[in-house]
């Protein structure tokens, strides 16, 4: 299977005007099976990726599990590349991810990764961002993506 943008479903989300879906067309893969519904939009020069936490995303303390926050961050790197960058997110890979947890995520509120591209070269995308819930910060991060061209069938 060629990894092209066609593996994503990113059309308008009728339940959230101004937002687009960010889902893999195969719901049995990680994004859909673990993260659930994801929506995204451009906000000026930034990208916002939103998830809707469920009980399965909580840890024993009743807050959003750190692994879920990390997964949202990783997915947001590729959303950023697609929404405000120039690369094909499908065949790309995460090279580096640095995260600082700042606070616990409330599972009753949407969780957003807000990102910006610091630099984009022919092969790399440097992204930084924050995970937020309204005015509350959950994490800060930076990451590097390695772009690859789509594989031929």
What are these regions (language model features)?
Residues 1-153:
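Terminal targeting signals and extreme-terminal segments of soluble enzymes
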